[in-house]
Regions:
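N-terminal start and proteolytic maturation junction detector
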Residues: 9-10
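Feature captures the catalytic ectodomains and active-site-proximal regions of enzymes
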Residues: 13-444
Length: 444
């Protein structure tokens, strides 16, 4: 497939070539985008393959702290100025960072004909390379890595669901609730968090580090996210400004940037619509066009000289129901497994007390073959999958970690409802389509 001069035509072979004005980006074909990529590392260098190190979601806030003149080092990014140089961020008194949930680099690239503002940014050579998100490539893990400038092995947020060791239950880390508990009779009565978010996620956020330096730090988002468990865990430390409409959230971010400091704006539509309808649906394209309009409004409304950086937490994969595997009906997969955490593209398996993780991993490898990468906890940690792992976090991680390749999904009908097992688009694994995210730089 070839995209030229803002038009689309199809070729029988090869990747996708995106061309407009002076810009040309070759997009691999879908088979290549759905292959597992090497595990990315953390640090302050820009690796030769341009994945990981300082070219990582976790490096964005440290880099921005340096760009606004208040470097905030973290445990995995000790040199914010090096991160700033690697990402190519200019100095500025005021900066806005926008995180568009679910807008992976290749999802963006393959739909740029619908996004005039984002297309204009992709004319710049500095914006034509993706950076990496964390593994697993999912919102809770990525938000915590982004907010703290660290990694899942330190934040204790390593999957959509994971083991809570004290109760030996699965905790769902969007709302910090018991993942397997029955739905409450009255859904309007809030369920208290299973664990205190500040106790689970103990790393200081970059926002907190900046606030301690008396730097203005503002968040603009939906009112309901102001004190949510995920915000408290991963993104605490800002003056949160809640507004109902997207336009008001954008304008609030622009107003805040009149004062030197850092502003964070969250846009969730690409992920939400992708899960409900699929990222290749007309609904997703409409949401994408709306996102582009919001970002263009931000550019027009922000004070001149404001640095604008646009990133995402992960990309999205269109599911193939023919490649869907239900663990519940495969005895080889359920044997020896007490709990199944994670999500359909990235599972964490917790072994029964007398079961060896190596034996579980062997059975899963035999069954899945090249449809997934199966590692024991020790192997995954040694590979650097979660970044540096502290001893407190280690028991929370699965005894076996499984990451799907291709369009494979791994579901469990014993504990998941029909909607959860049939999501049109998902994420979480270690493919380029999920791991590669944009880092688009603009100046108002």
């Amino acid at each position: 497939m070839v995209i030229e001069n803002r038009s689309l035509r199809t070729e029988p072979r090869g990747g996708v070539l995106l061309e407009w004005a002076t810009m040309s980006v070759e997009t691999p074909d879908m088979d290549e985008l759905l292959r597992l990529v090497p595990t990315v590392g953390y640090g302050d260098d820009a690796p030769a393959d341009r994945r990981g190190g300082a070219l990582h979601l976790s490096a964005v806030l440290p880099a921005l702290s340096a760009a606004i003149g208040h470097p905030a080092p973290t445990k995995v990014h000790a040199d914010p100025k090096a991160c700033q140089r690697a990402l190519g961020l200019p100095d500025a008194e005021s900066a806005i960072v926008v995180l568009v949930d679910g807008l992976g680099y290749w999802n963006l690239a393959m739909r740029l004909g619908h996004a005039p503002y984002l297309r204009s940014l992709m004319n710049e050579s500095a914006n034509q390379r993706p950076i990496a998100t964390c593994a697993p490539s999912t919102t809770v893990a990525a938000m915590a890595a982004f907010g703290t400038g660290t990694c899942p092995g330190l934040t204790a947020m390593a999957g959509y669901t994971q083991l809570e060791p004290a109760s030996h239950k699965l905790i769902q880390l969007i709302q910090f609730k018991d993942a397997l508990a029955p739905k409450p009779a009255n859904p309007h009565i809030p369920v208290p968090p299973m664990v205190d978010p500040l106790d689970l996620q103990r790393e200081e956020t970059v926002f907190e580090k900046l606030a301690a330096q008396e730097v203005r730090v503002t968040s603009s988002g939906l009112p309901k996210f102001s004190k949510s468990p995920l915000t408290e865990a991963a993104l605490r430390g800002t003056d949160y400004q809640g507004n109902v409409t997207p336009r008001d959230r954008v304008l609030a971010a622009a107003r805040a940037s009149r004062t030197p400091g850092l502003t964070y704006l969250y846009i969730r539509d690409a992920d939400k619509v992708g899960h409900n309808y699929g990222w290749d649906s007309e609904h997703w394209v409409a949401a994408f066009e709306h996102i582009d309009a919001q970002l263009a409004l931000l550019k027009r409304s922000a004070p001149k000289g404001t640095l604008i950086v646009i990133v995402a937490d992960h990309g999205m994969v269109q599911t193939d129901m023919d490649q869907r595997i239900d663990i519940a009906v495969e005895p080889q997969l359920t044997r020896g497994v007490s709990l199944v955490g994670g999500e359909p593209r990235s599972l964490m398996l917790y072994a029964e007390p007398d079961e060896r993780p190596e034996d579980i991993a062997c059975r899963w490898r035999d069954y899945l073959q090249d449809r997934a990468l199966v590692r024991t906890k020790d192997e995954a940690i040694a590979d650097g999958l979660f970044g540096p792992v502290c001893e407190r976090v280690r028991p929370m991680l699965g005894d076996v970690v499984v990451q799907a390749a291709g369009a494979v999904t791994l579901v469990d009908s014993r504990t998941q409802g029909d909607k959860a097992t049939h999501l049109p688009s998902v994420h979480g694994s270690q493919t380029a389509l999920e791991m590669d995210i944009p880092c688009l730089i603009d100046m108002a």
